Design a protein with these regions (language model features):
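Conserved alpha/beta enzyme-core scaffolds, especially Rossmann-like or related mixed alpha/beta domains
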Residues: 1, 43-44, 80, 115-131, ...
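Acidic/polar, glycine-rich intrinsically disordered N-terminal extensions of enzymes
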Residues: 1-47, 51, 178-179, 203-207, ...
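Flexible, glycine/charged-enriched surface loops at secondary-structure junctions
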Residues: 14-19, 76-79, 118-125, 218-220, ...
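Secondary-structure capping and boundary motifs in well-ordered enzyme cores
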Residues: 15, 42, 56-60, 95, ...
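Internal maturation/activation junctions in enzymes
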Residues: 20-27, 31, 190, 280-306, ...
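Active-site cavity-forming subdomains of large catalytic enzyme subunits
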Residues: 46-267, 271-272, 301-306, 357, ...
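Catalytic alpha/beta core of large soluble enzyme barrels
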Residues: 239-251, 291, 295-296, 381-540, ...
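Long, charged, mostly alpha-helical binding arms that flank functional sites
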Residues: 254-317, 327, 437, 444-468, ...
Length: 553
């Protein structure tokens, strides 16, 4: 598979050999669509699509049709519903609109009908703005109980687009006595204020839903659009929403369905590949070739996606193995040393990627959006979840998040296997404590080693699990690397089920204050078993939510 994908998207045989060697050394991994579809006729090598729902009968039905094709060719979809008029608003025929949610219900069924490839059903995340009159109901659409069953969308994921005005209102409401936290819900068609609610009440409901179901995802609209390339701002382009895994932040409109192809470097081996000058440039070239393949081969039903890919040629080079690198080098996640290395890593990746896209602009031509003719690719970096790719890469840590356990039982079709943290195993071996009993204790303690007397306090710091780490450090690291990430990051947060509500609020406020662009899942307990998605949407303890496999890479 490595050879097939490398050959399909390389410039020449030498480039293909280098890509194969990099993947064989586990220095990087192709995204699932690139690895699965490269060199075949099965589907497209694109991970993510973002489309915009127009406020018209034609716009909505066109959205359904486009979703069918995008999903069938293997991509996860994020759709923006913020422009669709709300329930009760007049239509062009003089009747009253049923609102956006019943139309989302159709997409909910559509995703069951259209599969990605052979085995996986379609995956879709609907996004709605925090000012939309239906946002209160939208927060609950994934809960199977309460409300009209015909307005529930339990097969979809969902995200809320939040502006600075809302977050500033929440900040003032929690710091100023008697502050009026009135929040206007405005119909996007008529611009009429449909309802006035308490911003704090809406915020509490949003956080409560994240604790109970892991969602909605959050996109901080102003931070995202402030970071849009100047040449796209001059064209009036705007990012309305994110994707299924919250790492893609590309402009969409009536003409553009955003496209992004992904693959990820393995930071666990940063010390090795950072010494190879051609490594990052080779990956940028490969991803640009993936885009070119899509532009040339996508069917006519994907015209909006082809147009967007042609105009901006955005790619998403991501990363995994961040925590594994720290453990390999005995660096605690919660440390200045980890912060320094984090900055060094992503500065290196961005500099090399930027150098290569400028070289490609000279060699192949700049993307049409760039009227200054400086870059081939409008966006270069995006950090995807990487759950599957991290397993392929020797069970390295997924994406930029901490390990959720130092030992867990992984369930596969072949049976159940005990997965151990290899660096912890090496440490225990050096202490003569690499025994079955010790590992059974670790599993019994949900993957934690804090109870082991054989480890020093410093060693326990290095092997803290995700839920044991102060979540502010996840935000700090994400904020520091965001400077180098053109798009966004799949940032997961981890809390115990009995988390203090003030702490939950403060971490989310910190994410906004530190200019993070998006937040992905809120996971309410450290994982003690492998990805085994529960069909139950609401649960007291969330072990694992479903990641979009298309975004793996």
């Amino acid at each position: 598979a490595f050879a097939r994908a490398a050959e399909a998207f390389a410039d020449d045989d030498d480039h293909a050999q280098r890509l194969y060697d990099y993947a064989s050394k586990l220095w990087f991994m192709f995204s699932t669509p690139v690895l699965s579809n490269g060199g075949t006729q099965r589907g497209m090598p694109i991970s993510c699509f973002l489309n915009y729902v127009e406020d018209s009968r034609e716009g909505i039905t066109d959205h359904y049709t486009e979703n069918a094709y995008l999903s069938s060719f293997g991509g996860g979809i994020g759709g923006s519903w913020s422009a669709v008029r709300s329930q009760g608003t007049s239509t062009s025929k003089g009747s009253e609109s049923t609102g956006a949610i019943p139309f989302m219900k159709v997409v909910d069924s559509e995703m069951l009908a259209f599969s990605q490839g052979v085995t996986r059903r379609g995956s879709y995340a609907g996004y709605m703005h925090i000012t939309h009159p239906e946002v209160e109901e939208f927060l609950d659409i994934r809960k199977p109980t309460g409300g009209d069953v015909n307005r529930k969308c339990t097969n979809l994921h969902h995200g809320v687009v939040i502006n600075d005005k809302f977050m500033e209102t929440i900040h003032r409401a929690t710091h100023e006595q008697n502050f009026d936290d009135s929040w206007e819900l405005i119909d996007p068609h008529s611009n009429e204020v449909k309802k006035v609610v308490s911003a704090r009440t809406l915020w509490v409901k949003l956080l409560q839903n994240r604790m109970e179901t892991g969602e909605p995802y959050l996109m901080f609209e102003d931070a995202v659009n402030a970071d849009l390339p100047d040449f796209q701002k001059r064209k009036g382009l705007y990012v309305n929403h994110s994707n299924l895994c919250s790492e893609i932040t590309l402009a969409t409109n009536e003409e553009r369905t955003a496209v992004c192809c992904l693959s990820s470097v393995n930071l666990e081996y940063f010390d090795e590949w950072s010494k190879v000058p051609a490594f990052i440039p080779d990956l940028v070239r490969m991803l640009d070739n993936v885009l070119e393949y899509f532009i040339e081969n996508a069917p006519s039903q994907m015209e909006k996606a082809k147009y967007s890919a042609l105009r901006e040629r955005s790619i998403g080079l991501g990363a995994m193995g961040f925590h594994a690198y720290m453990q390999r080098n005995n660096i605690p996640f919660e440390s200045i040393m980890a912060a320094s290395k984090n900055y060094e890593m992503f500065k290196h990746i961005k500099q090399d990627a930027l150098w290569e896209t400028r070289r490609l602009a000279v060699e192949r031509g700049a993307c049409p959006d760039d009227d200054s003719c400086e870059v081939r690719n409008a966006h270069l970096l995006a950090i995807a979840p990487n759950a599957s790719s991290s397993i392929i890469c020797g069970n390295t840590s997924p994406s930029i998040e901490p390990f959720r356990a130092n030992a867990f039982t992984q369930k596969t079709k072949s049976g159940s296997f005990l997965q151990k943290n290899k660096y912890l195993e090496q440490l225990l071996e050096s202490k003569g404590a690499n025994t079955d009993n010790v590992w059974k204790e670790i599993v019994a303690n949900k993957g934690s080693v804090q109870h082991l007397d054989i480890l020093t306090p410093e060693e326990k710091e290095v092997f803290k699990t995700a839920v044991e780490i102060n979540q502010s450090w996840i935000i700090e690291h994400a904020s520091m690397r965001q400077e180098f990430i053109c798009q966004s990051q799949s940032v997961n947060l981890f809390f115990p089920p009995d988390v203090n509500k003030g702490d939950l609020h403060n971490v989310h406020m910190l994410a906004w204050a530190k200019n993070l662009k998006t937040l992905y899942y809120l996971r309410s307990e450290a994982i003690s078993r492998a990805d085994n998605v529960s069909s139950q949407v609401k649960r007291e303890i969330i072990f694992e939510q479903e990641d979009c496999l298309a975004c793996e890479g």
